[in-house]
Amino acid sequence: MSFQILPIPMWVGTQDNYAYLLLCEETRQAAIVDPAEVNVVMPILKKKLKNKEIDLQAILTTHHHADHSGGNLNLKKEFPHVTIYGGSDQNGVSHVLQDKETLRIGNVQIEALHTPCHTRDSICFYAHSSNEHAVFTGDTLFNAGCGRFFEGTAAEMHIALNAVLSSLPNNTVIYPGHEYTKSNVKFASKHLQSEALNHLEGLCNHNQFIAGHITMGQEKQFNPFMRVTDPELQKHLGLNDPIKVMDELRTLKNQG
C-alpha cells in the first residue's frame, strides 16, 4: 500500500499557507487538508476529478483559523458528499474527531492527534500505510519552529511536540501549515549549532518549498522547540526546566 501527497501552496497576497492533497494510490480515494483558498484549490480538484485521477472523500481541518478552514463551506457546496473532519464543529466541520480516532482514505489509515495549544481544537493528522508515514501538523509544528500559543500554554505545546509528535516513527514526513522555514532557521541558529541545522539552511537556499522534505527524526535534531531538554540549549538560556525553556523560546521568537 502507498499514498501520494501533493503540496498546494496557497500564497495569495501575504499568505504562505499550504493545502495538501492526500491520495491512496490503490483506490484513488483522496482527502484535501486545510483548503482555505478556494480560488487556488478548486481548479486543481476539478481538473483531477474530471480526469478521474481522484475520488474526493474528505476535508481534513487542522484547526478553526480562517487561513486553514476558510474554504470548507464553499468546497462542501461544490462537493456535497464530502465529509469535513476537524477538532470542533466550526466552519462546516461535520465530524468532530476524538483524540486518536481513526478514519480511512482508501487503504490509508489516518489518526487524529489532539495537540491543543495554538488553538483548543488543533489536530495533527497522522497518515500511514504499511510502508509510509506522514503527518499534517497545521500550526502546531513547523520545520524548525512551532505555532504561537494563542489558546494554550508552554506546557501544552511541550506535550504536543515532545510527547505526541516526537513519538511518531522517525521516518514520518512532516507537512506543516505554513512555509516559515527560512525565518525559523534564522531564529534557531541563534540558539543551536548543529550540522543538521546547517543542512536545513542549505535546503532552504535551494528550495522555495520545504514541505515534505523533512522527517520527524531530522526535525528532532534541529528544532529548538523539540530540544528543550538539551543541556546546551538550557545552559544557553540559563534555564533547566523544559517548560520554561519552551516558554522562553516562544517569547523570544514572538519578539522577532
UniProtKB/Swiss-Prot annotation:
Which UniProt keywords are present, listed alphabetically? Cytoplasm, Hydrolase, Metal-binding, Nucleus, Zinc
Keyword Signal recorded = no
Pathway, per Swiss-Prot/TrEMBL? Answer: Secondary metabolite metabolism; methylglyoxal degradation; (R)-lactate from methylglyoxal: step 2/2
Which of this chain's residues are annotated to bind Zn(2+) 2? 67-68, 139, 178
Under CDD domains, the record lists:
hydroxyacylglutathione_hydrolase_MBL-fold
Matching Pfam families, A to Z? Answer: HAGH_C (PF16123), Lactamase_B (PF00753)
Q: What enzyme category does the UniProt record give?
A: hydrolase
Where is the protein found, in the record's own terms? Cytoplasm; Nucleus
Q: Give a GO biological-process term.
A: methylglyoxal catabolic process to D-lactate via S-lactoyl-glutathione
E.C. no: 3.1.2.6
The chemistry this enzyme catalyses reads: an S-(2-hydroxyacyl)glutathione + H2O = a 2-hydroxy carboxylate + glutathione + H(+); (R)-S-lactoylglutathione + H2O = (R)-lactate + glutathione + H(+)
Which annotated residues bind substrate? 148-150, 178-180, 250-253
Tell me the domain of life. Eukaryota
Which molecular-function annotations from GO does this UniProt entry contain? Answer: hydroxyacylglutathione hydrolase activity; metal ion binding
Q: Which InterPro entries match?
A: Clx_II_MBL, HAGH_C, Hydroxyacylglutathione_Hdrlase, Metallo-B-lactamas, RibonucZ/Hydroxyglut_hydro
Q: List the cofactors.
A: Zn(2+)
What's this protein's function? Thiolesterase that catalyzes the hydrolysis of S-D-lactoylglutathione to form glutathione and D-lactic acid. Involved in the metabolism of methylglyoxal, a toxic compound for yeast proliferation, by converting methylglyoxal to lactate via S-D-lactoylglutathione by sequential enzyme reactions catalyzed by glyoxalase I and glyoxalase II.
NCBIfam families (UniProt xref): GSH_gloB
- Kindly provide the name given to this protein in its UniProt entry: Probable hydroxyacylglutathione hydrolase SPCC13B11.03c
Species of origin: Schizosaccharomyces pombe (strain 972 / ATCC 24843) (Fission yeast)
Lineage of producing organism: Eukaryota, Fungi, Dikarya, Ascomycota, Taphrinomycotina
